[in-house]
Design a protein with these regions (language model features):
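Membrane-embedded transmembrane alpha-helical bundles that form the catalytic cores
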Residues: 1-448
Length: 449
């Protein structure tokens, strides 16, 4: 209410202060780190712009990137590096044991993209530190994305429109995202936990686990993105879309064009293309792809699981480029789609496991490793209890429900539903609230990144 009551010139200040309070509520120790990051990015951009066409401007740009990455390195990767150095004979360095600041991977990339864009001349340096601070700390997408570039909301930081229509659209998108998280992802999370803890593991229980895990991660992360985009609209911002039904893809290449779009485009524009992209010799192209995907894996987490996860996708993309990509294009959709789903099932098990051996043990369960039975009494019970949810979630992860709904809304009966829709949304909100009150604490999975 304070935001909407504030004069236009003070709206950014109100939003900035509120965003810092929101962040401090969860991470009070790291408000200073965020403020230092904001001031650093703001000052460096001004200096870079003054030296834009000189060598000193390039040097300043690299220094600004190094400063931003140093914060990420210290808080996210220091202990990972120390643990690996400690594997050397006679080395025993103490761990820093620093907790990971929430959202640091997201706002660090936003600051880096901003300073690089200023150096490239793609945007002017922001001269109002409150406006820049609002861009970095904007609370709807601060914690788990999407990764918003300065150029995405540059105009809206200066002047944005507010309307009942835009706010209503934002509320609707927020409630859809909340429902995805609470009513689908959290319940699927219950199934994954049950399958991991069952005393009667079977091949069926492991396949149920794999399917539920992929759908849980999708609805959890896309749900947060929906909530962030919805809140952004309420405050007059148009954030970029972050998902486009990735689970309907028929290749790894297509999947990553549809999944976490803001991260993929960030690595493309600020790492892959500067390295030369695909317009280089084959050896350099292979290097570029593997480097980008190992970095993508490391962005998700400081462990060899994520390095292997990212490198694996890099290898698969190279295989699709040089080996079986054309074959996939000629195959019927169902075959290429099953190929993609099989890869995603295996890769997300690696993504969610704590260690590589643990991931291999879980993947082995899919194929009966350890002489597992095909089914067990417990797995059949779980299938009866959660089978309909798995089917519903699988359908909801495709465009079919939205397409059918849009067609229905064009009919006479659909026009009546327009009047009922607010009641439906309120019902979803109340149901999600009831689930939250009755359930345990279930943070968004991408909070840890």
């Amino acid at each position: 209410m304070c935001y909407f009551a504030a004069p236009r010139k003070l709206k950014n200040a109100v939003l900035f202060v509120f965003s810092l309070i929101f962040y401090g509520w969860g991470e009070p120790r790291y408000i200073v780190l965020m403020i230092v990051s904001i001031v650093s990015g703001f000052v460096f951009a001004l200096m870079i712009e003054k030296k834009q066409n000189k060598k000193s401007g390039l040097i300043l740009m690299w220094i600004s990137v190094a400063v931003s990455l140093s914060f990420l390195l210290i808080f996210k990767y220091a202990d990972f590096l120390i643990e690996n150095v400690n594997q050397l004979p006679g080395v025993s360095l103490p761990l820093s044991k620093l907790s990971l600041p929430i959202g640091i991977s997201f706002y660090t990339f936003q600051i880096i993209s901003y300073t690089v864009d200023v150096w490239r001349g793609d945007t002017k340096a922001q001269r109002n530190i409150i406006s820049f601070g609002t861009y970095v700390s904007l609370f709807p997408q601060l914690i788990a994305g999407p990764i918003v570039r300065y150029t995405d909301i540059e105009r809206e930081l200066q002047e944005r429109k507010h309307s009942v229509t835009l706010a209503a659209s934002g509320i609707k998108r927020f409630l859809i995202g909340l429902s995805k998280k609470v009513l689908i992802a959290n319940v699927l999370g219950e199934l994954t936990d049950i399958c991991l803890k069952t005393s009667q593991p079977s091949i069926l229980s492991w396949w149920m686990y794999a399917a539920a895990l992929v759908l849980q991660i999708y609805f959890d992360f896309s749900g947060y993105s929906d909530m962030a985009i919805g809140l952004g609209r309420i405050f007059g911002f148009q954030f970029p879309e972050n998902f486009n039904y990735p689970l309907i893809s028929r290749s790894v290449k297509e999947f990553w064009r549809r999944w976490h779009i803001s991260l993929g485009s960030w690595f493309r524009d600020y790492v892959y293309i500067p390295l030369g992209g695909s317009r280089v010799k084959t050896g350099l192209y292979v290097r570029n792809v593997i480097a980008v995907w190992m970095l993508t894996g490391l962005w998700h987490g400081a462990s060899w699981n994520f390095v292997l996860w990212g490198a694996g996708f890099g290898v698969l993309l190279l295989c699709e480029r040089f080996l079986w990509g054309k074959w996939l294009e000629r195959m019927p959709y169902i075959i290429s789609h099953l190929y993609l789903l099989f890869i995603i099932l295996l890769s997300f098990i690696l993504f969610s496991a704590d260690t590589i051996p643990q991931a291999m043990q879980r993947i082995g369960g899919l194929f009966g490793a350890g002489k597992l039975p095909v089914i067990s009494v417990q797995s059949v019970y779980y299938l009866r209890s959660y089978g309909l949810l798995l089917i519903f979630a699988a359908i909801a992860a495709t465009p079919l429900p939205v397409t059918a709904f849009n067609r229905f809304m064009k009919t006479k009966a659909g026009s009546i539903l327009n009047w009922v829709m607010p009641i439906v949304l309120v019902g979803l909100f109340l149901l999600a609230t009831a689930f939250l009150v009755d359930g345990s604490y279930n943070p968004f999975l991408y909070f840890r990144f």
